[in-house]
Amino acid sequence: MLTWDEEVKPTPRMPQPGVSQGAQGVASAVNRPVPQVLHDGALAPAVATHATAGISAGGPRRVNAADKRIINGQTDVNQLVPFKYKWAWEKYLSSCANHWMPQEVNMTRDIALWKDPNGLTEDERRIIKRNLGFFVTADSLAANNIVLGTYRHITAPECRQFLLRQAFEEAIHTHAYQYIVESLGLDESEIFNAYNEVQSIRDKDEFLIPFIQAIMNPEFKTGTPETDQTLLKSLIVFACLMEGLFFYVGFTQILALGRQNKMTGAAEQYQYILRDESMHCNFGIDLINQLKLENPQLWTAEFKLEIRALFEKAVELEYRYAEDTMPRGVLGLNASMFKGYLRYIANRRATQIGLEPLFPNEENPFPWMSEMIDLKKERNFFETRVIEYQSGGALSWD
C-alpha cells in the first residue's frame, strides 16, 4: 500500500527491437486493439510537421499565427494561441456568457395548460408534438456531425474550441426538449421515434444524414479538391440549411404560442435555443467563408450550382414540414405564410456565403422573429424565470 511519503519508482521497460522508445510507450498504453478508431484528420499533419521540425531544427517549431489554416493546416492543433481567427474565440466567449440550463425554466403554467382539456386546440397540440418530434433527435444529429465529423477535419484550434462549446449546447437543447416532453407527460416513445414514423420529419433527416456519414467515415480525409469540397458541402448543409433553415418553422410556431401567452415555459426555452442556433449558424458561415478565402479553387461554378440545388431542396422539404404541422391556420399563421419566410431565409443564407439570391424580392413576413434572436438572456421575455443569474464568467465576489 502506497503512502504519500513513499517514492514511486517506475518499472523499467526493455525496448523492443526495431521499435522506437516513443512508439513503444504508445503501444504499452493500449491494452487491446480498438476496432474502427476514428482518425483525427487535423492531428496527423501537425504531428508529422513537429517530428520533422524536431530533427531539422533541434526542437519543435513554435506556432506562428500566420501559418494556421481552417483545414489541411500544418500547425499544432493543441496550441490554442497565438490566435489567428479571433472571431471564433469571440463567439466562443459569447456562447459561454449565454449559458443556460433547461431546469431553470418554470414549466408549471405549461403543465396546467396542457392538462386543461380546453387549454389548447387540437391544432395547437399537433404543432407542439410535431415540433418536439423533430427537435428531440435533430440536435443529436447536429452533435454527431460535430464530434464525429467536422471537429476531426478542422485544423484551427480556435474554431475547434467553439465546436466543442457548440456540441455541449446541442446536448443542452436535447435536454430541453426531453424536459418539455417529461414535464407535459407526453408519450416518450411517440415523440422520440417521430423521425422514423412521421414522413415530413423523416424526409428532412434523410436529406441531412448522407452529409454526416460522408465526413464521419474513418477513411475520409481532407487534402484533395474532391474531399475538401465534400467537407465544405457538409459545413454549408449544417450551418445554412439545418441550423439556418430547418429549425425556423418550429421556432416560429412555438414562439408564436408564447406571444399569445401559451406554453410560455417551452417558448422561453425555444427562445434560448434560437439564440444559440443563430450563433452556431453565424459561426458556421464565418467558417465557410474563411475556408473559401483560403481555398478559392473549391468554389467552382459547378460546385455553386450543386449548392443552389441543395438550398432549393431544403426549402421544399421545410415547406412540406410546415404543411404537415399546420394543415389549418392557427395562431394567426398558416402554412402558405411560411413559403415566403423560408425563401427569405434561404436568400439570406445564400448571400451570406457568396451565392446569388435564389428567390428574388422575398420579404420577411415575421419581423418579430428577428427581435427574438436579438433578445439577451438577462431579459426574461416570457417572465417564467423566478430568479435571473449571471454565468460564471460574469460573476464578481463583490
Where in the sequence are the language-model features?
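Short alpha-helix boundary/capping motifs
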Residues: E104-N106, P117, D205, L305
